[in-house]
A protein has these predicted regions:
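Extracytoplasmic/secreted cell-surface and envelope-processing proteins
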Residues: 42-45, 74-77, 109-114, 118, ...
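Extracellular/periplasmic catalytic domains that process cell-envelope and extracellular macromolecules
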Residues: 25-28, 58-59, 93-97, 134, ...
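Alpha-helical scaffolding segments of alpha/beta enzyme cores, especially the outer helices
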Residues: 120-130, 134, 161-168
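Structural recognition of the beta-strand scaffold that forms the well-ordered cores
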Residues: 31-36, 40-41, 63-68, 98-105, ...
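Catalytic His-Asp segment of secreted/periplasmic serine-dependent ester chemistry enzymes
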Residues: 145-252
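Oxyanion-hole/transition-state-stabilizing segment in secreted/luminal serine hydrolases
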Residues: 79-123, 147
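Fungal secretory targeting signals
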Residues: 1-22
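Serine-esterase "nucleophile elbow" of acetyl-processing enzymes
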Residues: 19-70, 84-95
Length: 252
């Protein structure tokens, strides 16, 4: 009887070690909804940014929607109804997708004519991020895409106020920061003014991106997001050649 009891204990111990753990439910694919100004938006006569270039890196069934709006501020994006559209996209996707909302503003908020103070800008960013979290999605706060204006050989930093404000909001609210300004500045400084001008939407426009520029800076965004969350590698495709050129500071 004692031997039988011992064998029973050993058998149970063996089963506890060898019985496979039940598999987790199937991982949800990612969905990215992009909120921002013309430096995120689809290429058009009035603007164009990194958004479509980034969305092109997504691997189905992952998908995204670019809701960047030319001329938008953190105020006008809400008042004009764009933010409500983004939130509706989130609501309709959260059951089937792991939803991320990119939030990048600043280019227009910093313009005096738009009457958005830095304090208000920070409050607005925090509010947008909170709205996303309340719906069970993940906000990604982006610092602004760099402009490509040079003084001689030196790239000008003319977005410092809104960039620093965005970093402060991310830190204070414990929201993931994607420091696109730092990454885009590093790359643009490395390739220089003449090469950077090849990304201009039209001659002399050193703010917006043409289609090729969207692909290159969209790749920068993809790599930054992958660095911040390696679990997304299933849904964001890689381009080793392009990523290497960017990392080396070589025009791509």
């Amino acid at each position: 009887m004692a031997l039988r009891a011992i064998l029973s204990v050993l058998l149970l111990a063996h089963l506890s070690v060898t019985t496979p753990t039940p598999k987790h439910k199937k991982e949800k694919p990612a969905a990215f909804f992009l909120a921002g100004d013309s430096t995120t938006a689809v290429q058009s006569a009035g603007g164009g940014g990194w958004g479509n270039g980034f969305l092109a890196t997504l691997q189905p069934p992952a998908y995204g929607v670019n809701k960047g709006h030319n001329g938008a501020t953190t105020v006008s994006f809400v008042k004009g109804g764009d933010w409500a559209t983004v939130l509706n996209l989130v609501k309709n996707a959260t059951d089937a997708y792991n939803v991320f909302v990119t939030i990048q503003f600043g280019h227009n908020d910093q313009k005096p004519a738009n009457n958005v103070s830095i304090a208000q800008f920070k409050t607005n960013l925090a509010s947008l991020a909170s709205d996303v979290q309340e719906l069970g999605a993940t906000p990604l706060l982006f610092t602004s895409l760099s402009r490509r204006n040079f003084n001689g050989a030196q790239l000008i930093q003319d977005l410092g106020d809104v960039v620093n404000a965005t970093r402060e909001v991310a830190a204070a609210s414990h929201i993931k920061l994607i420091d696109l300004n730092a990454a885009s500045r590093t790359y643009v400084q490395a390739i220089g003014s003449a090469e950077a001008d090849k990304y201009n939407l039209v001659a002399g426009d050193r703010t917006h991106l043409n289609a090729h520029g969207s692909d290159v800076f969209g790749r920068i965004v993809a790599d930054l997001i992958l660095k911040s969350d390696k679990s997304l590698s299933r849904w964001i495709g890689r381009n080793a050649t392009l990523s290497h050129l960017i990392a080396e500071g070589v025009y791509a």
